[in-house]
């Protein structure tokens, strides 16, 4: 089933860490889960978080800590930290709890599936040929040291009347191998012909299993 399921969810607690770190009883779990989704959806819409690769939510004694993984930390922090303070205030208003925001820089954006997918989406929205955008992304990912990469786009490609899917692949992308560190992400491009969906798989090599202490009992959502 490695071909059908989400590669990140498939490997969570095996070689991937949880993206939500908290404990919740039967009464709290649903509330916390919905709150996590709201936080992520809110951050995705913020202009300062457009270059974000993902968000990790931690909870402890009535407080929430949100770690924003981004290739452009200066954009999230803002002038003299003004943007971060604004995010804290807005998140506190959204959740009703004290929220601490941490910034984690993505050192190699070419090897991050979310950033690669977002880059392809932006190029398609700027009317760059989807094939050219895909091939350019493949080349940059492989040049950065990946063992394999696959990119797929779906929709009314180049304004075609009938929607279809096209994909390009370079190297190895073993989706069934749990020890393979596969990064996966999706994005969408809004064009005059409709929505174009983008999927990216990147093989970063083999990885040891995540220690049990990092995930035992933690609740998670797979949405980034």
From Swiss-Prot:
Pfam families: KH_2 (PF07650), Ribosomal_S3_C (PF00189). GO terms for cellular component: cytosolic small ribosomal subunit. One of its GO terms (molecular function) is rRNA binding. InterPro entries: KH_dom (IPR004087), KH_dom-like_a/b (IPR015946), KH_dom_type_2 (IPR004044), KH_sf_prok-type (IPR009019), Ribosomal_S3_C_sf (IPR036419), Ribosomal_uS3_bac-typ (IPR005704), Ribosomal_uS3_C (IPR001351), Ribosomal_uS3_CS (IPR018280). The keyword rRNA processing does not apply. Signal peptide: none annotated. Belongs to the universal ribosomal protein uS3 family. This is Small ribosomal subunit protein uS3. It comes from Chlamydia trachomatis serovar L2 (strain ATCC VR-902B / DSM 19102 / 434/Bu).
């Amino acid at each position: 089933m490695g071909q059908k399921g989400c590669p990140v969810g498939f490997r969570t607690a095996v070689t991937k860490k949880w993206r939500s770190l908290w404990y919740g009883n039967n009464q709290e779990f649903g509330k916390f889960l919905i709150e996590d989704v709201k936080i992520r959806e809110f951050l995705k819409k913020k202009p300062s978080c457009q270059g974000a690769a993902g968000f990790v939510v931690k909870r402890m004694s009535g407080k929430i800590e949100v770690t924003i993984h981004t290739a452009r930390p200066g954009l999230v922090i803002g002038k003299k930290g003004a943007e971060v303070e604004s995010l804290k205030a807005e998140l506190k208003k959204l959740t009703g709890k004290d929220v601490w925001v941490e910034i984690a820089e993505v050192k190699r954006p070419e090897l991050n599936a979310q950033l690669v997918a977002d880059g392809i989406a932006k190029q398609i929205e700027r009317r760059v040929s989807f094939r050219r955008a895909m091939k350019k992304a493949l080349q940059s990912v492989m040049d950065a040291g990946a063992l394999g990469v696959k990119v797929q786009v779906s929709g009314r490609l180049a304004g075609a009347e009938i929607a279809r899917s096209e994909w390009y692949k370079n190297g190895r992308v073993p989706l069934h191998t749990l020890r393979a560190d596969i990064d996966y992400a999706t994005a969408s491009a809004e064009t005059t012909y409709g929505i174009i969906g983008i999927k990216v798989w990147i093989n970063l090599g083999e990885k040891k299993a995540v220690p049990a202490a990092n995930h035992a009992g933690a609740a998670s959502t797979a949405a980034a």
